[in-house]
Amino acid sequence: MSSISELYDVTWEEMRDKLRKWREENYRNSEQIVDVGEELINEHASKLGDDIWIIYEQVMIAALDCSRDDLAWSCLQELKRQFPDSHRVKRLAGMRLEALERYDDANKLYDSILQDDPTNTAARKRKICILRAQGKSSEAIRELNEYLEQFVGDQEAWHELSELYINEHDYAKAAFCLEELMMTNPHNHLYCEQYAEVKYTQGGLENLELARKYFAQALKLNNRNMRALFGLYMSASHIAASPKVSAKVKKDNVKYAAWAAAQISRAYQMAGRGKKENKCSVKAVEEMLESLQITMS
C-alpha cells in the first residue's frame, strides 16, 4: 500500500506543516490527522526536533477519536518517557481511559492532578466530560455552573453548557450562555447562528424576529454559512405567515425569504456545476422551498 507521501507526492516538511495548520485552526479531522501523523511519526520522527512532542499529542487525541488505541498507546508511552511527571501527559492518559470507558480510573487520575494543582482547569473539565458521557446531564450542568463562577471567561465551558441546556430543552438558559459567548466574541458567526437557532426553536413572534436578525448577522460574518441561510429563509417565512404582523412587516419578510431562497438555489447550483447527480439535489431544494413559499395574499 502506498504511503501518504507517495500517494500525494508530498514531503515530510509539508506533512509536518499540514499538521501544524490543523492544530492552529482547531480542525478535528481525526482520520486525516491519523493518516498523516502516523506516517510522519513512523518514518520521520528523527527529523522533527521538538515538534515531535506536540505531534505525538495531536496524533494521540485523533487516534482516540478513531478507536486506534494501539496508536494512542504508543504516542502516550513516548510522551510519558519524555515528560514523566507532566500533568498534561497525565490528562492524556485519562482521556485514553475515558475512550476505553474506564471512567472510575480516569476520575482517579484527574483527582490526583487536582490534588497537586487545584487550579488545573483541564482536569476539572475532563471530569465534567465524564459526567456527560455517563448521561449525568444534571450533574454536569451543576459542575459547569460552579466552574464558570470561577472561570467566567472560559468560552469552551460556556459553549458546552449551552449544548447541555439544549439537550435538556432549557432554551432560555441555552440562549443566555450563547449571549455570553457573543459578548466576548461578537465576530464568531457560529455563535450567532446557534443563538438564532435557539430563538427559532423557542418560537413566538419576538423570538422569530430575533432569530432572523441573528441568522442575518451570521451571514454577514460568513456568507457561506448555509445553516444561517436556511435559518434566515425559515424565520422570515414564519414571520410573514403570522397573522399578528402588519402588511409592511409581511411584505418585508416575504422579500427576505425570497432573497434567501434565491441564494440557497444559487449555492446548490454552483456547488454541483458539471455534476449530473446535482440536478436531483437542486430540484429537491427548489421543491422544498416552493412548498414553504409565502405569498402576499
UniProtKB/Swiss-Prot annotation:
Q: Which domain of life is it from?
A: Eukaryota
Q: Does the keyword Membrane apply?
A: yes
Q: Which InterPro entries match?
A: EMC2-like, TPR-like_helical_dom_sf, TPR_EMC2, TPR_rpt
Provide GO CC annotations from the record.
Answer: cytoplasm; EMC complex; endoplasmic reticulum; endoplasmic reticulum membrane; extrinsic component of endoplasmic reticulum membrane
From the record, what ranges are coiled-coil? Answer: none
Q: Which GO terms describe its biological process?
A: protein insertion into ER membrane by stop-transfer membrane-anchor sequence; tail-anchored membrane protein insertion into ER membrane
Residues in TPR repeats = 87-120, 155-188, 192-225
Q: How does it assemble?
A: Component of the ER membrane protein complex (EMC).
Give the function comment from the record.
Part of the endoplasmic reticulum membrane protein complex (EMC) that enables the energy-independent insertion into endoplasmic reticulum membranes of newly synthesized membrane proteins. Preferentially accommodates proteins with transmembrane domains that are weakly hydrophobic or contain destabilizing features such as charged and aromatic residues. Involved in the cotranslational insertion of multi-pass membrane proteins in which stop-transfer membrane-anchor sequences become ER membrane spanning helices.
To which protein family does this belong? Belongs to the EMC2 family.
- What is this protein's record name? ER membrane protein complex subunit 2
